[in-house]
Amino acid sequence: VADVGRFWAPPNPDPAAPPPHSTGAAVDLTLARRLDMGVHELLEMGSEIDAIGALSEPDHFSLRAAACADPQQRQTFLRFHGHRQALREVMVAAGFVQHPNEWWHFSWGDQLWAWRSGAPLAHYGRIDSTVETD
């Protein structure tokens, strides 16, 4: 429970400090391999999207591999790390930045992006719903 605050931003009514996904500038994603026309398989990343804890850290399996004495387990850790690295490389090449604690979370144009990229300002603020309900 103590780790939850590291991964989910609480609701914040301050338009100057919106949670990243509410700006439309953040995306959670993984990689898949195409097996056949219309058939895909998710690549193993070592944890599910939204996992809480050390498993979610982008370089977690690199560190685990470095400390692992079992060659087979080490290869598994390196495979997970390689998949995470491939995702990061593709997204960074497209101008996104990665959340420091989540292998799956990338941003472009929000406050996280401005902080990690050194941009002076974010491009996007909070998007408020305009959908009316009865």
Spans of model-derived segments:
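Terminus-proximal functional modules
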Residues: V131-T133
